[in-house]
């Protein structure tokens, strides 16, 4: 029996978007869901209690980074990642593939895996489909990812075809290496870039392996948003309706809504936490850069329509002062707000699906946020 079970609750009559629940060994979370990223077993500056309070049903941690520091064996010794970081709800881990291909300047892709340099100290390392699974088995996450190749955008059709075929072979090897299928659900990752025929081939290969869930990788890597939407429209119908669908690395408000409309259930991205550290905030009326001089004497909250801890207690002027002085508390406040904003957005999306009005909600949100303006600023 699989460790992961998807329950479809309702389909939006306007768009076909899905409202559901995903059941895991560490509890159930509602979908569509945005997952905060805790790269090194922590969502930067946030406590587990704060994440739960703002509605984070699941968080993500990075296999590559935890493999390097502190090492999977230490985490196994601690009783697994949940105990190590004191988080008793679901955890998803990636495979390490994206970091290998994005952080390491020197890498050599072979059939057996990837030889590359540690981005911290230059040491030679090797990661294979089997090793990626072994590390994740030691971490004990509820949802694991297959090891995949992450080609850059754009890549030639010829290269992408070879890459997709290799990723499919790696997925099968990872499945065979998985030692704890009743405790941890392993997702396959659909690749293929912007090529619809290769996306179809990748989906067919992975669906034939009967994973308990499917990720859509290789998007949000520099392609235009209309290309991402087109790929999603083509890809999600090829995936089983009774399994979860996860769009990797996407976290801007417009892309979350557009992804849900195209049948996606799960999302993750470092965007809300990364931009928070620079003082950039997501608000119901668009992007707000708190360091700007115009907020020096502005004693309103970051977002007057937000009921998060930050907005209920602190002003733009105060937070601007903290960020400009590089005070950690300022980063905590902007991080809290941005995560709350996206988690609350997904809550609104779930309500809109329940009420069969997601297309209307999208139009209202885009109008208020400013995405419909020709000078719209995104992240």
UniProtKB/Swiss-Prot annotation:
The signal peptide, as residue positions, is none
Its annotated pathway?
tRNA modification; tRNA-queuosine biosynthesis
UniProt keyword Zinc present: yes
Give me the comment on cofactor binding.
Binds 1 zinc ion per subunit.
Q: Where does Zn(2+) bind?
A: 306, 308, 311, 337
Recorded GO MF terms: metal ion binding; tRNA-guanosine(34) queuine transglycosylase activity
Catalytic residue positions: 94 (proton acceptor), 268 (nucleophile)
Provide the catalytic activity annotation: 7-aminomethyl-7-carbaguanine + guanosine(34) in tRNA = 7-aminomethyl-7-carbaguanosine(34) in tRNA + guanine
Gene Ontology cellular-component terms listed: cytosol
Q: Which domain of life is it from?
A: Bacteria
> Which cofactors must be present for this protein to function?
Zn(2+)
InterPro entries, alphabetically?
ArchSynthase1/Queuine_TRR, TGT, TGT-like_sf, tRNA_ribo_trans-like
Q: Where is this region: RNA binding?
A: 249-255, 273-277
The UniProt record gives the binding positions of substrate as: 94-98, 148, 191, 218
The record's Gene Ontology biological-process terms are: queuosine biosynthetic process; tRNA wobble guanine modification; tRNA-guanine transglycosylation
> What are the entry keywords?
Glycosyltransferase, Metal-binding, Queuosine biosynthesis, Transferase, tRNA processing, Zinc
What's a Pfam family this protein contains?
TGT
Give EC number(s), comma-separated. Answer: 2.4.2.29
Q: So what does this one do?
A: Catalyzes the base-exchange of a guanine (G) residue with the queuine precursor 7-aminomethyl-7-deazaguanine (PreQ1) at position 34 (anticodon wobble position) in tRNAs with GU(N) anticodons (tRNA-Asp, -Asn, -His and -Tyr). Catalysis occurs through a double-displacement mechanism. The nucleophile active site attacks the C1' of nucleotide 34 to detach the guanine base from the RNA, forming a covalent enzyme-RNA intermediate. The proton acceptor active site deprotonates the incoming PreQ1, allowing a nucleophilic attack on the C1' of the ribose to form the product.
Provide the family line.
Belongs to the queuine tRNA-ribosyltransferase family.
By its UniProt entry, which HAMAP family does this protein fall under?
Q_tRNA_Tgt
Subunit composition and interactions = Homodimer. Within each dimer, one monomer is responsible for RNA recognition and catalysis, while the other monomer binds to the replacement base PreQ1.
Q: Per its record, how is this protein called by name?
A: Queuine tRNA-ribosyltransferase
Q: Identify the taxonomic lineage of the organism of origin.
A: Bacteria, Bacillati, Bacillota, Bacilli, Bacillales
Please state the gene responsible for encoding this protein: tgt
